[in-house]
Amino acid sequence: MTKSLFNDFSPVSAKAWKQKIQLDLKGADYNDTLIWKSLEGIDVKPFYHTEDLESISHTIDSTTSWNICETIYAQNEAHANKKAHYALSKGAESLRFIIPNKELSIQALLKNIDLTSTPIYLDLEFLDAEFVKNSPHTSIHINTDIIGNLIKSGNWFTNLKEDHNHFDAIVKHTNKFSVNVSTYQNTGANMVQQLAYALAHTNEYLNHIHNTEALNIKFGESNNNALKVNFNVSIGTNYFFEIA
């Protein structure tokens, strides 16, 4: 259906909505009953109106584009490849594979998948620079987050020095790294805390990269050679905050 039905209804002011709600409350206090305070310290109202946006100067009329992504655990290349093709046939626009070990063949995993039109994300459950260097296509995003692994497991993959050596080699080859923000969400951080931890997490990497002359990465470039960061963010249970 392409025809909008909103024009068939008269506009209702925020004041009229609130009066209707107060009538339905039958004497109960509006603020005590319906307004709640979020973990971020925001008083959340039971409804919002376009009038609430009039005093906000930084709203935008459009949103950034996004792709439907299917996550597949790649224990077996053939089975995972079959699942990937099925997901793409059902509307998936990008694929995220969780890779359990370095013996897995990326070529077999991605067989007959159009890598020029389908973004591919690989989450490695191990750390190996040579595995990354042998990836068949530059458009593949390999999520490398040694700090994230330390936070999640309490341990480095090997040790601090070896992990950073692998990290340096991977970043030099791909010009990319990732920040797994989902760990903070899953351990109870609110949205403000997640943003703060994600920025601090990213800053640790940027400081390291800036101080590692062998990487020779220049900041501030806006071309294909610019350093790219992939943020993996979990979706929480607060519907209104998630869609904002």
Indicate where each model-derived feature is located:
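Catalytic alpha/beta active-site cores
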Residues: 1-241
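Active-site loop/helix belt of alpha/beta enzymes
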Residues: 244
